Amino acid sequence: LINGVLLSSLCMVANAADNVAGAGSGVAIGTGSSAQKDGVVAIGKGAHTNYAGGSGYAKVNGDVVIGENATTHSYYDQSGSVAIGKNAYVENTIGKQDKFFAFNQTNFNSFGFGSLPQKPDKVVTGVAIGDNTYVRSGGTMVGSHNYRGKIGDITVNTDTYAEKRKAGLGLYSTTLGSNSFTNGTVATTTGALNVISSNYDGNNIANATRNFGATINGSLNSIESATAANNYSGLSNTVVGTANRTNNSNGSLIFGAGNEITNSITDIDAGAITPGLFGGPSSVTKLSEDVRNLVKDNKSGGSTLAIGGGNKADYTQLTSMTGVNNTVTGTAGNVAKLNYVTGYNNTITNASNNIVMGNDHTITADNTIAIGGLSSSETRSVANTTTIGYDAKASVEGGVALGYKSNATVDKGAAGYDISTKAASTDTSSTWKATAAAVSVGDVANDLTRQITSVAAGTNDTDAV
């Protein structure tokens, strides 16, 4: 009995709470914990607040750190951070970006890099809640982050501070969801297993424009800019749904599942969102206005839209796809532009200025209008054609087919019938000789003809009667 009591007592001692007082003038509980300022709380083994700057500012308080090795690190006495969870980390930086987003809440002591806020408590800080979370100034990250492996175009490792930092260095970024990662200024990810990736590592400010304002809402989505060649990749991309992807694209909009937009990108005049020597906009309202003007002035970047499922665009600009399994592709030297596609299983390849509504159309020429479905897939390789109706076809450039199964096959240059000579006219004027392909309302080769009714008398010699 005595041995049992002693053993029980030893177990209780071995499992006792780690309530060892830590260091600092704040509230610090836990072995190796540290709360360096009054009004700061650090609870947990190795939990600590760290202030690298020596501002001498009196109002340095409000940081809350709870969890094993949870940390807030402020470069210059910024305060108000929250880090909750094992290895949660908040890094409050000082630099041109931080000054740009200060919105005149405080003055800085110099221009450009190295300028320090006169009132550090007026500079925004971060909130990280969940194991292995990491955010920079102004950021919010909530959720468990223990994934190690490939996601989008990067490989993440949440084991170390340095690796976590690579995936989440965007200022004012927001991540809500387990094992999602956001590296973009004012970028937002909501949902699990998403990524907004960048090669921005805090050094090359030119890379910081990647993913500015990018947004994901859903799961298994990726906005990939880490491997992109263009520093404006990801800017203003919006993805809503499941398993969608953009890569090396800006101004892209995706709503649905399984859609892909790649290489839909233009260079952007990003002066309005690029930190300079003299800080940034005077207010959030002004920044919002600046971004609206940037979007308008730059024609929304690559500006490709995909709504539905399984749509794919590559090397496109100013393109819209609505429906399922539509594909629009160009090349680096021949970008497909100004295409509008709605329906199912339509394809546009190396062509621009097309309107397709229906199913199973394959377009390889410019300036085509195809409205209506097809009973089987067909390739349109001649330009400037218009077909309206189910199974309507046009096989000559500029041909027009109107109605079910109509077929435009008569090319320009056909001479009109001269009743006076009872033969084709020899007059080569446009009155007698067509300068564009014919309009067809049937297919005489397949015994399909139509009357055209309710036609008024013509005014000119070239009017139908």
PLM feature spans:
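Glycine- and small/polar-enriched repetitive beta-structure motifs of secreted/surface proteins
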Residues: 3-465
